[in-house]
A protein has these predicted regions:
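Generic secretory/membrane-interface signal
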Residues: 4, 17, 42-44
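Acidic, low-complexity Ser/Thr/Gly/Pro-rich repeat segments typical of extracellular/periplasmic
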Residues: 27-141
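Bacterial N-terminal signal peptides that target proteins for export
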Residues: 2-12
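Bacterial N-terminal signal peptides
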Residues: 11-23
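A detector of low-complexity, intrinsically disordered, Ser/Thr/Gly/Pro/Ala-rich segments
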Residues: 1-4, 19-20, 134
Length: 141
């Protein structure tokens, strides 16, 4: 019984060492991962959003490729009316979409999907898909 336990513990230690070495060899860190959305305005899941806001902002974890985006609509009735072209702020992490919103409406926008991957960092890695959903209020605050 004691011999089996010793062999078992050695196997566990060996597997842990392989895992640690492999993880280090791969260089797993934030710098070599694909970009992710770290914030949106309005926030995803927000209710009673002021329909008078004129832009949607999405901020990524790293600098992004200019003039490359995928604001993907699921259904036309849930996508905002666009006013001009998207653009990045000087930080190259925040993309602005000028919009016209309607009161008491649900908006659903994918930022990248499996099929549309044009939100990319400066190294060309596509951002992880992100679902932005929010509802506007009646506009009477």
């Amino acid at each position: 019984m004691r011999m089996k336990l010793t062999v078992y513990l050695r196997c566990i230690v060996a597997l842990a060492a392989v895992f640690i070495i492999t993880g280090s060899a791969l260089g797993l860190n934030l710098e070599n991962q694909p970009p992710v959305v770290v914030g949106t305005v309005p926030e995803s899941g927000a209710k009673n959003v002021d329909p008078a806001i004129r832009e949607i902002r999405v901020t990524f974890s790293t600098k992004m490729m200019d003039k490359s985006w995928s604001w993907v609509q699921i259904a036309p009735e849930n996508f905002p009316d666009l006013v001009g072209e998207p653009r990045y702020l000087e930080d190259k992490k925040t993309c602005i979409l000028k919009v016209r919103l309607e009161p008491e409406k649900t908006y659903i926008i994918w930022l990248n999907t499996q099929r549309y991957t044009n939100f990319k960092d400066t190294d060309g890695r596509p951002a992880q898909p992100y679902l932005l959903m929010f509802e506007t209020g009646n506009g009477k605050f």
